[in-house]
Amino acid sequence: MLSVNELALDIFEELFEYAEELHAVPHELDNGARIVDCGVSTSGGYLTGRRFTEICMGGLGEVDISMGKIRDFPIPFIEVSTDFPSIACLGAQKAGWTVNVNKYFAMGSGPARALSLKPKHTYEVIEYEDEFDYAVICLESDHLPNAAVMENIAEACNVDVANTCAVVAPTASLVGSIQVAGRCVETAVYKLNELGFDTKKITAGIGHAPIAPVKKDGTKAMGSTNDATIYHGSIMLTMNAPEIKDYLDKIPSNKSKGYGKPFYDIFKEANFDFYQIDTSLFSPAEVVINELSEGKVYHVGAVNPEVTLKSFGFI
């Protein structure tokens, strides 16, 4: 069986070795754990963001960045594709691990989750778990983890702490903007999973989303990076599942009652309480489904340039 940690480790090793050329900073802790700072105390960059995203997808995704436009405004776009959508997106990329050790907090994603099985239900549904002696984790945080944090991760993954590897970037950083936009396909797969659809029937996924300009404030950065997919993420999924027609109307973000405002404004109105936000908002703007058994194509949703540009600060 494919090992997402083994595949991601190869990318991590390259990032660690060539960190200086990538505006990243490598660290090896006293306990042997290795960390690459991709934006906490350094600038990071587009190539670093690509590598971060590839690691987050467990080495099962292809990532490209190119310039595009939203109306008359030039903006970089990330394009992500995978031929293993269920494993790459839910088994690795999903931010399903809250790392909270002493005073350290981070949202954890990446292939290490497939060792720790966080959350376990996800791996039961996709019928996948990894077996490998290295754990590779992606941490969305303003701070680097210390030895105690890495030991906690190692214990959860049942590996030696010297075999733990972490890439770290704040939301309010270039790599942060890139890797969140790089979750555009994941949001579609995640949404279908939440609706009860068997995501193992999805055979391929591709999508693109604009990379949000970096905000100084972390909460505002969280808003604009999420808006990249909510209001301008375009996804195509290939599958063998004629029953998908029963799910179409519930997939895109414009079906959410919170739709129509920048995420930061919605979050502020909810007194910055996630539990008051309609979770169906966390979906791509538009999705195309190519259903193979009946040879049909479905299209739902639409991009919203107005809200995207407002969120990004262009208008």
Curated annotation (Swiss-Prot):
GO CC annotation, single: cytoplasm
Recall the GO molecular function terms of this protein's record.
methenyltetrahydromethanopterin cyclohydrolase activity
Tell me the Gene Ontology biological-process terms attached to this UniProt entry.
Answer: methanogenesis, from carbon dioxide; one-carbon metabolic process
Keywords for this protein: Cytoplasm, Hydrolase, Methanogenesis, One-carbon metabolism
This protein's source sits in the domain of life called: Archaea
Q: Which reaction does it catalyse?
A: 5,10-methenyl-5,6,7,8-tetrahydromethanopterin + H2O = N(5)-formyl-5,6,7,8-tetrahydromethanopterin + H(+)
Question: Where in or outside the cell?
Answer: Cytoplasm
Q: What is its EC number?
A: 3.5.4.27
Q: Name where it mostly resides.
A: cytoplasm
Q: What class of enzyme is it?
A: hydrolase
Q: Give the pathway annotation.
A: One-carbon metabolism; methanogenesis from CO(2); 5,10-methenyl-5,6,7,8-tetrahydromethanopterin from CO(2): step 3/3
Known role: Catalyzes the reversible interconversion of 5-formyl-H(4)MPT to methenyl-H(4)MPT(+).
Under NCBIfam families, the record lists: one_C_mch
**What family is reported?**
Belongs to the MCH family.
Name assigned to this protein: Methenyltetrahydromethanopterin cyclohydrolase
